Amino acid sequence: MQVHVVDHPLAAARLTTLRDERTDNAGFRAALRELTLLLIYEATRDAPCEPVPIRTPLAETVGSRLTKPPLLVPVLRAGLGMVDEAHAALPEAHVGFVGVARDEQTHQPVPYLDSLPDDLTDVPVMVLDPMVATGGSMTHTLGLLISRGAADITVLCVVAAPEGIAALQKAAPNVRLFTAAIDEGLNEVAYIVPGLGDAGDRQFGPR
């Protein structure tokens, strides 16, 4: 599996805001949107493009556009905070949704929503989730995508734990992962340390 850490001063600054416990809900959402855009830039750096003949006010020239805009798949609910900025950068993209909650006793994923196209053959997919902790929610999501024929899958997250990366490597070794940081690991209740806290609660308030 390809793992890319986005090492950029602007990404580090937004990540600092997200980590800071003093950041309120609105500030957290704003920093997440801005960091999502930086992740999108890096993840699409080598995206296939096609030439587009156009005319400027002065002359004819040739521009470019993405050959195949991706399907964006936010993992609810925390991934909701990433989808608007990703969609703004990729306006031709379609959007699917996967909903996965976490059982606080077992730390296992509890799926509750699957809104994806039936056939994803030859469709590039970008999965959006601020955190890859145990990897349970993400491996569930990847399984849904792969079962529908998806083969070109990129995961975008803010922070990832080594345990989660190992789980993804085992479940879907051909996936690409772009993250702003790989943290130390998981604590006794399977939260990433130092992490961000609960990314859903920090965006929208506690459930």
From Swiss-Prot:
Q: Which keywords fit this entry according to its UniProt record?
A: Allosteric enzyme, Glycosyltransferase, GTP-binding, Magnesium, Nucleotide-binding, Transferase
Show the SUPFAM superfamilies listed in the entry. Answer: PRTase-like
Give the regulation of activity. Allosterically activated by GTP.
Cofactor binding comment, as recorded: Binds 1 Mg(2+) ion per subunit. The magnesium is bound as Mg-PRPP.
Enzyme superclass (EC): transferase
- Cofactor(s), by name: Mg(2+)
- The answer on whether this UniProt entry bears the keyword Transferase reads yes
Catalytic activity of the protein: UMP + diphosphate = 5-phospho-alpha-D-ribose 1-diphosphate + uracil
Record's signal peptide:
none
Which positions in this protein are listed as binding 5-phospho-alpha-D-ribose 1-diphosphate? Answer: R77, R102, D129, P130, M131, V132, A133, T134, G135, G136, S137, D198
Residues binding uracil: I192, G197, D198, A199
Record's keyword annotation contains Cell division: no
Q: A biological process (GO) annotation for this entry?
A: uracil salvage
Task: Copy the pathway line from the protein's UniProt record.
Answer: Pyrimidine metabolism; UMP biosynthesis via salvage pathway; UMP from uracil: step 1/1
What would you give as a GO molecular function for this chain, any one?
uracil phosphoribosyltransferase activity
Report the protein's function.
Catalyzes the conversion of uracil and 5-phospho-alpha-D-ribose 1-diphosphate (PRPP) to UMP and diphosphate.
Record's family? Belongs to the UPRTase family.
Name recorded for this polypeptide: Uracil phosphoribosyltransferase
Q: What gene name does this entry carry?
A: upp
